[in-house]
């Protein structure tokens, strides 16, 4: 076991029994407690996204035109805390939101060509709702949520997969959707309790004996899927459950590179939020190492890259550090 895993495991085991106590007093830090290199790394990444966005609101590189990826880039900008209507990135945020709104089906609210896109784009609308001055956001968000619920009601697993008509489900697509539902509920949109409970039941059906989460059943648990599972149970206010605690232990004893690096930054995006809910000490240790690792791997132009393209990868890397700012409603605990 490498030093990173040893540090995380030690921290987790020391506080895991006291998670309910921590939940009452988490995260009262301020800008003075940020890791000193955070701001320069984050701004360098945002500057890359700003420069790589074209006049239509899309981003350079693979998947940079996908509304879900554009949504994550918008969220990364919102997460820094600049005024979305007059700050440095306001034009970029509005361009991105415009792409998402124009990508939505006018009849049923479906955004893009996959539920992955729909989930991340819906999350962006939820985080922008009430912050970005655009009267179209509220109605589009309500339609997007209605499509999610209707899709789930038709799904035999009670969750989601690639299309709104899918009858099977997996933990990765469902994660993007379920987090969007929590964000929409935070924004004041009505989300049926049954939608959350059915989705959590699906996740329970994917639990493995070692505390991880499989893909579509009790199969092949890995770091990203388990980070997603931990997060959705945390957002459902089940941080005192054995499911959440065991998932955090799984993450603490496995490498973020356990998928061969292909989904490394994707896993960081979810793991950051999962550890954030696990308690001050585990998150601070994880966060410090994550920032140092991302600093060392950041390209000269400010981006990070992978097989998912520079826009998605950069947004995911930034969002894994964005909890330090705690400006987004979904990050308020």
Model-derived regions: residue spans:
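Bacterial N-terminal signal peptides that target proteins for export
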Residues: 1-9
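Bacterial N-terminal signal peptides
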Residues: 8-20
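Surface-exposed loop and membrane-interface regions of Gram-negative outer-membrane beta-barrel proteins
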Residues: 100-104
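Predominantly the C-terminal beta-signal and adjacent terminal strand-loop region
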Residues: 295-299, 305
